[in-house]
Amino acid sequence: MRPRALPALAAFTLLAACGAQADPNWRVIDPENLMVIETSKGRIIVELRPDLAPQAVARMKQLTRAGLYNGLQFHRVIDGFVAQTGNPGNKDGGKSDLSNLPAEFTAKLPRTDYHAAVTRSDGSAGFLGTLPVETTSEAEDRRRNEGTTQFWGAYCPGVVGMGRDDAFDSANSEFFFMRGAARRLDRLYTVVGMTVDGIEH
């Protein structure tokens, strides 16, 4: 596996943006928040979400640019659940030399880029860009009167999260791709992004 941040994919993004101008529903992804992972099965492209998990996304970019992920295997693959990588020792439970990260299970954000698909009395479900998310209710937002909504990633197929030990504040370098829905992980693991291409790999 060889992940890389995408200065090289800027040309791809520019070409995509040219086609996007004809379609008002097209959304161009910031190349700074794209991660390309080359595997023996094909290319995987992930849109990282620093608005939801700024420290975890910064760590993934740092480790990618440092080459830590180059040549690593997916050391934990469970059909219908996850495919996990990012351990420098190619086994479960390893870490980089950097300190562990704090949990970033939820984020307070404005509703500007949010598209609700389902609204309930206790919250809503929808998308932040390509990422499936859940939120607190608008009534709760008004009660808090902060001008923001509490968001958290919904662990659906293609969502990318940070691996960790039993302690909530133990994410470090490992990350995983959801291969099926596991909503029991919501608000227990930091969501860092969404697979936008190559989910079949």
Regions of interest found by a model, annotated:
Residues 18-201:
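Cyclophilin-like peptidyl-prolyl cis-trans isomerases
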Residues 6-7, 38:
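Intrinsically disordered, low-complexity Ser/Thr/Pro-rich tracts
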Residues 7-16:
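Bacterial N-terminal signal peptides
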Residues 1-2:
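N-terminal secretory signal peptides that target proteins for export/translocation
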